[in-house]
Each structure stands twice: as C-alpha cells, then as structure tokens.
Amino acid sequence: MSIGILGKKLGMSQLFDEQGRAVPVTLIEAGPCRITQLKNDDTDGYAAVQIGFGETREKLINKPSKGHLTKSGEDLLRHLREYRVDNVDGLELGGSITVSDFEAGQKVDVSGDTMGRGFAGLQKRHGFSRGPMTHGSKNHRQPGSIGAGTTPGRIYPGKRMSGRYGGKKTTTRGLTILRIDSDRNLLVVKGSVPGKPGALLNIKPAVRVGAKPAKGGK
C-alpha cells in the first residue's frame, strides 16, 4: 500500500520505448522515510501517518522536536509530512516507507516548489506582448495602462504586474512511474516535475486516475 513518500529531484533524462521513441523522464531519489507518528480517531480525531526524510545537524533541532523524533528511533530528520489514511493498521512507529511501496505503471501526483526566478517583468512573468521597437516609440517593455484615473482611481486587486516570479508550491498531477530501482531508492517518472535538481518533492498516489472524458461527454 502506497501512502506517500518524500524525495529529492536528481534531474532529467530519457528512456526509449518499444517503438524507439524517446520518452523524457525525471529521476527522483525517494526515501527511505521513517514513520515518526501514527494518528488515529481515538486520540487525534482522524487517522494519519507522519513521515520524516533527510538528515540535518543536531544544533538545528529544538528539544520538543528532538523528543518527538526520538520516539521513532531517529532524531535528526529534516523534513516532516503527514498523510491522511483510512486507518493505520499494518503500520508501526519507527517503520520505513520505501519506493518498494509503489509499483511501475502507477499514477502519482508530485508536489514541490517551482524554480525561483526573482523579480521579473511582465513579458517574462505573464507572457505579455512587447510594444513597438521603432518609429519613435519608447514603450518597449512597459506595462501600458494599469487603470483609469478618477474612476475607479485605484488599481484593482489581482492586476498582473511585475513582481517575484516562481518559488511557489505547485503540483503536477497524473504522472506515471515507469521504473523503480529499490537498491538505489530511485523512482523514474515520466515527464517533468517542479523544482530544480536537489529540490524536495512530495510524491503521493494520484487523486484523479483514469482518462479524461471526451468533450461534451459525461
């Protein structure tokens, strides 16, 4: 049973299918993740599994967190995530979640932070068209009008303008696991996932599984 797992993006590569077509893939080093807490309806009001991943220095963990992690036999975990489940039967505190809990062909949703690009203008951030480059125009990359004067006399919230681009959490849904390497804790996922190499990823079984219905269909 696959609940979810944390991993690190290694980079992209490609595989070749039976027809000789190149398939872009992402290599993810996932787990092993330690089960740090089990929640149930009696004590917490809901059932969930908390897992930890990645090492950190002892000086960066405060005493409450260290005491919490010590119960699972590991006190230097950097990242913690919780997954809701129907029940925690068959799971034990201090156990491990590995790539072996997934299977080839399974659909997963991968969450992570997108690449941060810093402060960006309208063309890069929103794909706006540029202004004329010749005939005396000085409006090359400027935004143009951002609102009327007297009425409404302000800029409406949500107006697309320059600002910080990227560095936000996003989820890529419905990716297929093509291969699993249990010896090296690797997941080979078809397509791209958020973030740059080394970024933390959250891999969960897909919420929506199956083909999209035809347009106009049910």
Curated annotation (Swiss-Prot):
PROSITE patterns: RIBOSOMAL_L3. Part of the 50S ribosomal subunit. Forms a cluster with proteins L14 and L19. Keywords: Ribonucleoprotein, Ribosomal protein, RNA-binding, rRNA-binding. One of its GO terms (cellular component) is cytosolic large ribosomal subunit. Belongs to the universal ribosomal protein uL3 family. NCBIfam families: L3_bact. GO terms for biological process: translation. Residues 126-169 are annotated as: Disordered. The gene is rplC. Pfam families: Ribosomal_L3 (PF00297). This is Large ribosomal subunit protein uL3. InterPro entries: Ribosomal_uL3, Ribosomal_uL3_bac/org-type, Ribosomal_uL3_CS, Transl_B-barrel_sf. GO terms for molecular function: rRNA binding; structural constituent of ribosome. One of the primary rRNA binding proteins, it binds directly near the 3'-end of the 23S rRNA, where it nucleates assembly of the 50S subunit.
